[in-house]
């Protein structure tokens, strides 16, 4: 009698990576099930609104949106926007890229912090969130004073991409290595192309500013991780 074959997991990734990807999908599902009024509230408080960020009571936005009332309300969308997506294609693409990029990163971080789970997972999450905040700040800065709103985890995922590309250079190489600069240039060119063709091809604007900011944030934070790896091996 042949033993039963084990079915492969739906998401072939370590559970922290699979769990984070599922959080993105479940968050979108829950938001989509809310009444329209509550969906609008989630978008209002969780999306990045350059108009709200840059306006004030003395200089109101052109659209009439009120400015953020305090620092926490202004900072919240820099993280919360990662868990809000425009549609199902948006969230599924981001979840797929998250799994593809976070899996090798988590494996590397487990070699830096062996036997100290959830330390490696927390480090990976911190890298993602740092890149997401960097992407949000870049988007707000380059959308001054009244750009359109932005949502999605692509800024943090761009940071994971930079981290993966930097891994290929090894812990002893820096951000100005030739291969990393070439890969980064291709990333910038790809975003420039999608910024022009995105509205006609995808029916939506591409937040290229967020992608570039997240990429730089991910590269800088990953450089710190690789520096820590060098110290452990010394």
Residue locations for each model-derived region?
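A detector for small-residue-rich transmembrane helices and their helix-helix packing motifs
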Residues: 1-234
């Amino acid at each position: 009698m042949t033993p039963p074959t084990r079915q492969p997991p739906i998401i072939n990734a370590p559970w922290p990576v699979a769990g984070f990807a599922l959080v993105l999908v479940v968050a979108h599902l829950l938001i989509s099930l809310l009444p329209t009024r509550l969906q609008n509230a989630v978008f209002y408080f969780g999306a990045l609104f350059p108009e709200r960020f840059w306006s004030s009571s003395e200089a109101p936005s052109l659209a009439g949106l009120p400015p953020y009332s305090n620092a926490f309300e202004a900072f919240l969308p820099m993280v919360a926007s990662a868990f809000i997506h425009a549609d199902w294609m948006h969230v599924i693409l981001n979840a797929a890229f998250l799994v593809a990029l976070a899996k090798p990163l988590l494996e590397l971080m487990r070699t830096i912090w062996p036997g100290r789970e959830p330390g490696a997972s927390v480090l990976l999450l911190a890298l993602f969130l740092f890149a997401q905040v960097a992407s949000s700040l870049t988007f707000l800065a380059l959308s001054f004073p009244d750009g359109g709103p932005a949502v999605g985890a692509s800024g943090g995922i761009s940071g994971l991409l930079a981290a993966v590309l930097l891994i290929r250079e090894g812990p002893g190489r820096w951000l100005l290595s030739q291969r990393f600069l070439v890969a980064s240039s291709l990333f910038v060119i790809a975003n420039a192309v999608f910024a022009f063709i995105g509205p006609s091809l995808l029916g939506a604007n591409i937040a290229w500013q967020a992608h570039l900011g997240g990429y730089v944030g991910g590269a800088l934070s990953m450089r710190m991780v690789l520096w820590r790896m060098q110290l452990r091996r010394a």
